[in-house]
Curated annotation (Swiss-Prot):
Residues 2-28 form the 4Fe-4S ferredoxin-type domain. [4Fe-4S] cluster binds at residues 9, 12, 15, 51. It comes from Desulfomicrobium norvegicum (strain DSM 1741 / NCIMB 8310). This is Ferredoxin-1. Its cofactor is [4Fe-4S] cluster.
Length: 59
């Protein structure tokens, strides 16, 4: 399961840009959310690796 730590997320949107099928921005907030937590899309790992504050993880 892919999760985002919203305390750590800075809203840079890199995960959304890299993997829009798994991540989206929360309306009205500068935070990302996971729209497909059980996705196996390769880009999800790219987004995890690219997160500048390491807010995304797999559990």
């Amino acid at each position: 399961t892919i999760v985002i730590d919203h305390e750590e997320c800075i809203g840079c949107e890199s995960c959304v840009e890299l993997c829009p099928e798994v991540f989206a921005m929360i309306d009205g907030e500068e935070k990302a959310m996971v729209t497909a937590p059980d996705s196996t899309a390769e880009c999800a790992q790219d987004a995890i690796d690219a997160c500048p504050v390491e807010a995304i993880s797999k559990e």
